[in-house]
């Protein structure tokens, strides 16, 4: 990024799940905590955005984090116009506190193991009952393979939308 002056801003929305799969599947990460892996991921970027409604387990909010003072100043000046002061970004104190707690919980090895484990359990059960799903099973949801589930519906008749409407 320094050589070409192109900043990398990472969308951190599912970072805990990604860190979990790195921990489980990549050599050399087996003994590292989710928190350590997330910190390493962040070290490769110039900043990050996050919708806290996903991994941070809250119903509102998100954030922009940068490690460049000039970018911070520019963002701080813009947030006043759109969201409120930079100290709270339009969020109530209770929402910021919940987000802080949620971020901490989201990088807990026990939490993410249980959460991803539930998804894997559901995916395996669906497979056991011959429901065609997209594989490999991910960390936040199971996707029914609509083409295989409704093979009589041609692609140009939108099998996925048909399945969603029927459900």
Walk through the language-model features, giving the residues of each.
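Conserved PLP-enzyme active-site core in the AAT-like
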Residues: 1-133, 144, 154, 161
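Cationic-aromatic interfacial patches
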Residues: 137
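Short glycine-rich, basic-tinged beta-strand/loop micro-motifs
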Residues: 141
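Active-site loop ensemble at the mouth of alpha/beta enzyme cores that anchors a bound cofactor
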Residues: 147-167
């Amino acid at each position: 990024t320094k050589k070409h002056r192109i900043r990398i801003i990472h969308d951190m929305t599912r970072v805990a799940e990604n860190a979990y799969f790195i921990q489980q599947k990549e050599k050399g990460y087996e003994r590292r905590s989710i928190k350590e892996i997330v910190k390493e991921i962040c070290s490769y970027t110039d900043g990050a955005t996050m919708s806290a409604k996903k991994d941070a387990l809250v119903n509102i909010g998100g954030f922009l984090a940068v490690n460049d003072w000039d970018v911070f100043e520019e963002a701080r000046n813009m947030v006043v116009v759109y969201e409120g002061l930079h100290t709270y970004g339009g969020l109530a104190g209770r929402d910021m506190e919940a987000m802080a707690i949620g971020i901490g919980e989201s990088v807990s090895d026990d939490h993410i193991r249980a959460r991803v484990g539930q998804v894997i359990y559901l995916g395996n059960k669906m497979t056991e009952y011959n429901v065609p799903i997209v594989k490999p099973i991910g960390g936040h949801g199971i996707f029914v393979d609509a083409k295989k589930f409704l093979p009589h519906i041609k692609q140009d008749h939108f099998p996925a939308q048909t399945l969603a409407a029927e459900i």
